UniProtKB/Swiss-Prot annotation:
EC number assigned by the record: 3.1.1.73
Effect of residue 458 to A: High decrease in catalytic activity
Record bears the keyword ATP-binding: no
Annotated TM spans: none
Binding, Ca(2+): 272, 275, 277, 279, 281
Name of the encoding gene: faeB-1
Glycan-linked positions: 28, 49, 66, 95, 113, 195, 234, 298, 328, 367, 506
Identification of the protein by name: Probable feruloyl esterase B-1
SUPFAM superfamilies assigned to the protein according to its UniProt record, in alphabetical order: alpha/beta-Hydrolases
């Protein structure tokens, strides 16, 4: 099978993996070794002729060395998290001018174990930073891989201030430009060009993947989009609203971190067993409608104990678990799903502004560096929605062009996401179904959505959340354990995933696995084995 022909250099520490690497390569790819590949790389700079581009460097990177982060500014982490190359590749760094007031920085990593496949990575937050870990992950599988800084360096919105060109890069242009340039470099470097084009991204990267599906359907054959920051304008308004609910730490409405722990424990008490198993994980938060009043302090209790809430605090918590509405009661954004309270505190409930919302309103909506999130109202949300620069909301429900060209989307979202409510993904799925007048079985031909229980924002948390979405979540090379390989199998072999199998990792050790259902089905424990037995669950 084509999927099993993908090379696995990052597993080369085992003899079995090393043997597999030596004995396999994509029949559509090219396997370069030693000095010939190095010579091809070192002579490639003179052959690059990309419009509006300034090539900084073309460097041969051998296997087994720390990859230089000289082009990664300190605002993006610099070299604090070095990556060791487990494969040889040709590294190209360049700037591409997108307007008289904007440019992107990008890199292309062209591996010696090329599989005949192209892949673009995405970004995160308001960034701003090349996702080098994702580039290493994809290039390790033999993809010619590109990544950009999304039009500016840094994970904040300062660069947007009075510069709509940088906003345009962030909305869509940086990724699309990187794809166009990256494909040109790939075709020029490898005589056979590329056969299929893929995308892998989460959060802002998830939104970027969906923007490509909606606006540039020919860019990719397969898109893996996690925890998308789509409905972007209303997402920022949702993030701004939390401070108006909680107040600062001195407000009577403020709920302390200790009290949020009590809230979380009560939610788990009420909702954990709704899926049939008491495992500390809420499989489907849709079923969880917590009665927070159960935590009201009685006559002998004090809210200062951290174990109970005042009436004002209960109102705050209920507000968090309520949808956000705008002028005239118009729906803006769904509630925060219950189960994510512990991680969400630092981002949303701590009595301080959510930085991304603050930056978007300051530097884009109002162009006022002194704007105060505490003053946010639904009128502000209406102003932001009326702008929606370059349709950054990324909410088009008509995916017909992508469907007709044969594209595939694998969409996933963690059910404990503390940054982007997982309910937003469910709302979008239904929006696509309604817009295209397609049932779930009809959507299945090109669009499949997998809610991942026990996953926080893009990765990790309490449950079996490692699904091969990146280096730190690698849990196997079977397509059912790896969303990137599942996408390759779907595109190239026509075998679509009916489930995504996640792993609960302890370091690199798999503690247990669970099959995550394809929406709109949900997982239910039916026994008779332990909840750690994947065969004790079924999709209903």
């Amino acid at each position: 099978m084509l999927v099993m022909q993908l090379l696995l250099p990052f597993l080369a520490s085992t003899a079995a993996a090393a043997a597999a690497i030596d004995s396999t390569s994509s029949s559509n790819g090219s396997d370069h070794h030693g000095s010939s590949f190095q010579a091809e790389c070192e002579s490639f700079k003179a052959k690059i002729n990309v419009t509006n581009a300034n090539v900084h460097s073309v460097t041969y990177v051998p296997a087994g060395v720390n990859i230089s982060m000289a082009d990664n500014p300190s605002i993006c982490g610099g070299d604090e998290d070095p990556i060791t190359s487990t494969f040889a590749f040709c590294r190209i760094a360049l700037n591409v001018t997108t307007s008289s007031k904007s440019q992107i920085f990008m890199e292309a990593w062209l591996p010696s174990n090329y599989s005949g496949r192209f892949l673009s990575t995405g970004n995160g937050g308001l960034g701003g930073c090349v996702k080098y870990d994702d580039m290493a992950y994809a290039a390790g599988y033999g993809f010619a891989t590109v990544g950009t800084n999304n039009g500016h360096f840094g994970n904040n919105g300062v660069s947007f201030y009075q510069n709509t060109e940088v906003v345009e890069d962030f909305a869509y242009r940086a990724l699309h430009t990187g794809v166009v340039v990256g494909k040109e470099l790939t075709k020029n470097f490898y005589p056979q060009g590329y056969n299929k084009s893929y995308y892998l991204g989460c959060s802002t990267g998830g939104r970027q993947g969906w923007k490509s599906v909606q606006t540039f359907p020919d860019d990719f054959d397969g898109v893996v989009a996690g925890a998308p920051a789509f409905n972007f304008i209303n997402l920022t308004s949702w993030g701004a609203r939390f401070l108006t609910l909680t107040g600062d730490s001195s407000a009577e409405t403020f709920v302390t971190e200790t009290q949020w722990t009590a809230v979380h424990n009560e939610i788990i008490r009420q909702c954990d067993s709704l899926d049939g198993a008491k495992d500390g994980i809420i499989e489907d938060p849709d079923l969880c409608q917590p009665i927070i009043e159960a935590l009201l302090c009685n006559a002998t209790q004090s809210s200062t104990s951290g174990t109970c809430l005042t009436g004002a605090q209960v109102k705050t918590v209920n507000g968090v678990f309520s949808a956000t509405y705008g002028l005239n009661g118009s729906f803006l954004y769904p509630r925060m799903q219950p189960g994510s309270e512990l991680a969400a505190y630092s981002s949303y409930y701590s009595g301080t502004p959510f930085a991304y919302a603050e930056d978007w309103y300051r530097y884009v909506v109002f162009n006022n560096t002194n704007w105060d999130v505490a003053t946010w109202t639904v009128q502000d949300a209406a102003i932001a929605n009326a702008q929606d620069p370059y349709q950054i909301s990324t909410w088009n429900g008509d995916l017909s062009p992508f469907q007709k060209k044969g594209g595939k989307v694998l969409h996933y979202h963690g059910m404990e996401d503390a940054i982007i409510s997982s309910e937003s993904s469910k709302v979008y799925y239904k929006h696509v179904a309604d817009t295209m007048n397609l049932s779930p079985s009809e959507l299945d031909s090109f669009y499949r959505f997998f809610p991942i229980s026990g996953m926080a924002h893009c990765a990790n948390a309490d449950g079996p959340s490692a699904i091969g979405q990146g280096t730190g979540t690698f849990a196997g090379n079977n397509p059912q354990d790896n969303v990137l390989l599942a996408m390759v199998q779907w595109v190239e072999e026509g075998v679509a995933p009916d489930f995504v199998r996640g792993a609960k990792l302890n370091g690199s050790t798999v503690e247990y696995r669970r099959k995550h259902c394809k929406y709109p089905k949900r997982n239910r424990y039916v026994g008779p084995g332990s909840y750690t037995d994947e065969n004790a669950w079924e999709c209903v």
